[in-house]
Amino acid sequence: MSNIIPEKGINFKVYLEGRDLLGIAEGTIPNLEEMTSEVKGAGIAGVIDSPVLGHFNSTTLSLTWRTVTSDFIKLTAHRTHNLDLYSSLQQYDAGLGIYKTVQLHVYLKAIPKTGTTGNLVVGDVQGTQMELEIPYMKIELDGKERIELDKLNYIFKVDGVDYLAQVRSDLAMN
């Protein structure tokens, strides 16, 4: 009997326009924080912080390099950059007593927001950092598309269900 326990990320790689970004020390995948507004009044016992269907607050990717690199410099250009983040995730199958891995692939269209070149410290990393705005994100887990968010084209899919399809139709976008 299978009893999968997700454990950890084994390692990851970041690719810019299909080419490996060297020197990345850490990456923070964007959070999905929905836009909300309060609903209150007659017939409601209190306040509900109601999400706006398929709409999200700013989604950002944070990358940290050990030092300033040419790839860091390239990412500061004022244009959309295509990034692919790949991670190998470790799982333990307690039923079979074996380890296995699954691939996490996060595809992003990224626009630079902030960049810090870090600190100059003898014998240590600089901690060069960048934050990028993400208007488009697709997450695949173990080869299956799980989430797609396209803010500019009114697409928000979770496990194949497009929660903005009717909104696009209502706006005469289909």
Language model features by range: what are they?
Residues 20-24, 39-46, 86-90, 125, ...:
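Eukaryotic N-proximal low-complexity acidic segments or loops
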Residues 25-56:
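A positional/architectural concept
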Residues 42-47, 67, 109-118:
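Short acidic (Asp/Glu) patches
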Residues 48-69, 124-137:
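Oligomerization/assembly interface segments of phage tail-like spikes and tubes
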Residues 60-113:
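A contiguous binding-surface segment within folded domains or other stable secondary-structure elements
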